[in-house]
C-alpha cells in the first residue's frame, strides 16, 4: 500500500501534509482539526499492522472496564445539547471573523473539547452538591458534545459566508465589470440563506452511513483527527487527565480575558478604518504602504501558535514574494500592461494580477493534491480488496465482525459496541432520497439560475465524490472540500452559460457540492471518534444532525450581524476583506467567460505560477527529507490578495511557540494550544459587543493615526491657519 506522510509530523520536522494546509486556507482544505497535543496519529495502516500495534499498546478500555456504557439514548442528554448550543454560538462568531478576515481557520477542537468538558463538569458538580445528580458525566456524552459543537460551527465555514454566498452579492460583483448584472447577483438575506443551508447541509449525512462498518472496522482507516479527538476525550475522563484539563482551561481563561480586554482597549482608538493599533506602521511607513506591518492581533498570533511552523513561514514568504517584489514591479507597468486610469481595486488592473495569480497557485496546488489523493485512494482500495479476495465493496449489515486475525481486548470491545446500535439501511437510503427530492424541488426556487436537473446530476455524482473524499480523509486527514466546490463552479457555470446566469449557478452548485462532500467526511470522522470512545453510532448520527441544524440557524444569524454591523465586508483593505469571496467569483467568471477579461501578461504569469505549484508539490513528495524546508504553495497564495500583515502576526506566534518548545517542550505541547485558543476566542468574542456598538451607532472617540514627518508638518501648518 502506498505510504502517506503523517500530518502530525509538521511540527516535529518531517513532511507536512494536508493537515498543515487545512489551517492555511480554509476555503480550500477543511478538516475537523485535531488537538495539537495529540500528534501521534498517522496514515491508515493495513489491518495486520494496526492490530499488532494496538495489541502491543496499553489497553485503554481496561481502564474504563468498571464503568458501564450508557445506552445511545442515555448518551443524548439535555445538558449536552444546552452546553453545545452556547458553544456553537461562541465558535461560530470566532470562525466567522476568521472567515471574513483572511480565511485561515485553525483547529478549534482543543478549545471545543476543553470547554465542553469544563462546563458539563461544572453543571454536574453543582447538581451533585444539592443531591440531584441522576447521571454521571461520561466520555460518551463528552463525545456527543464534541460532535454537536464541531458540526454546528463547521457550518460557519462550509456555509460559504466567506466565499460562495458572499461571492453572489452586488458588493463583490462591483469589483469587476464582467457578469455584473441582475442574472448573476443575489444579495445575502437571512431568510433565503437559512433555507438554502437546511436544504443542502443534511443530505451528506445520509450518503455514506451504510459504509461506516467497512471504513472503520474492515478497512481500519485511521481518520487522524477523529482518533486524536478520541484520545483527548479518553484522557479527560481519567483522574490525571481531568487535572491536566483543569489547568488547560485555566490557561485558556486567562488569555481569553486578556485578549478580550485588549480588543476592548483597541476599540477606543479606531474612529475610522485607518485608525488604531491595527494600522500601526511598526516596520516603517514605506513597508506599511506595501501591507507589511504588525497589527497587534491576538487572533492571528494565536493562529500562528496552532499552525505548523512551515505553514507560517510559507505565508510570510508568499507575502514577501508578492507585496515585496512582484506587485511593486508590476505597478511600474501601469499604462503599459493595464490602463493608468483604472483604480487599484479593478480586476482589469492591479487587482487582477493579485487575484488571478493567487487563483493559479491555489488551483495548481489543489489539482495536484486532488489527483494524488485519487491515486492513493485507488491503490489503497485495490490493496484492501485483494486482502479480502472480494470483487465488490461490502455494505454495512447487522452481523458481527468476522475475522481470522487475533484482535486485542480494546478492538474486540469497540467492534462489539460499534455494530450493536445499527442505523437501519432504510434510514440512510430513504433519508438521502427524501432530502434530495425536497432539495431538487426547492433550491431552484431560491436560485432560479440553477435548474432542477442540474441539482439531480449533482446528487447522483455526489456520493461517489463524498466516498473518495471520506476515504482520503481517513488515510491522510486531508479533506479536499473546496477543490470539489471549485470543480463544480467550472462545470455547472459552463453548463449554464454566461447568458443564463452561469456565474450564480456555478457558485450555488459549489455550495451544494461542498456541503455534501464536507458533511460526509465529517460524519465518518465522528464515527471514528465514537468507535474509540465507545459512543454509539446512533448517538453520533443524532448529535451530528442536531449540531448541523443548530449551525444552519446560528451561522446565518452571526453572519447577518457582521453584515449589518460592518458596511465594509468584502472591500479590499478593510477590516473584513473576505478575500475568498473575490477569488470564488473570479473563478466563476473564468469558468463562464474564459480568459478574455484578464489584463495583459496576467495569463502567462498564471500559467507560470500554476506550473510552479505543481513542481513544488512534486519536489516535496519526491524528496521528503527536505520537504519540511520547502514552502507550501497554497499557503503562499493567501497574502497575494490581502497583504502580509497577518503573516507577520502568525510568524510571531510561531516564534513564540518555537522558543517555548525549546525551553520546555512538554509544557508547550500541553498548554500551547490552550493559550492560543484563549487568544483566538477572546479577540473573536469581542466582535459581539463591537457589533452591538456599531448597530447602535456608537463610534470610538479617538483616532490614532501615523503620519510621516513631512505630512505632519503640513497638517500642523494647516491647523495653524484654522486657528488664526
Curated annotation (Swiss-Prot):
Provide the free-text tissue specificity comment from this protein's UniProt record.
Expressed in leaves and at low levels in root cortex.
Q: Spell out the disulfide connections.
A: none
Which residues lie within the region annotated Disordered? 1-54
Q: Where in the cell is it found?
A: Membrane
Q: Which UniProt keywords apply?
A: Membrane, Transmembrane, Transmembrane helix, Transport
InterPro entries according to UniProt: OPT, YSL-like
**Pfam assignment, any one:** OPT
Record-level Gene Ontology MF annotations: oligopeptide transmembrane transporter activity
Highest rank taxon of the organism: Eukaryota
Q: What does this protein do?
A: May be involved in the transport of nicotianamine-chelated metals.
Protein family according to the UniProt entry: Belongs to the YSL (TC 2.A.67.2) family.
Write down what this protein is called: Probable metal-nicotianamine transporter YSL13
**What is the organism field in this record?**
Oryza sativa subsp. japonica (Rice)
